[in-house]
Amino acid sequence: MLFRSYLPDSRPTYFEVTNALALKLFQAHNVDYGVIETGIGGRYDSTNTVRRADKLAVITRLGLDHIDILGDTLEEIAWQKAGIIPYDGTVVALKPEQNSVREVIEEIARGRQS
């Protein structure tokens, strides 16, 4: 799923399996709201399979982590992170340090009418 080209085979990762188990437990226990943290990035993350009308996406501070996968600038990383923004939903982004990062997040939010 996420960055499958880095994996030697097509088996799900540990993160993907535990994410699926957590979602199944949420369903089995009729959880009203669950807090789900993305693994790496967000845009192609297995946690991004959750589709709910009341989904709230929260984007916290960005850093230059996983640059070999997400990109080597804060703007590229912001684009990856903003992939969790739901269509017609709600997004909260902690105050980005750079205007260019804020602009990336706002552009994607506008495009998704969030």
Regions found by a protein language model. Give the residues of each.
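ATP-dependent carboxylate-amine ligase catalytic core
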Residues: M1-R51, D68-L70
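Acidic, Mg2+-coordinating active-site environments of NTP-dependent enzymes
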Residues: N30-E37, D54-S114
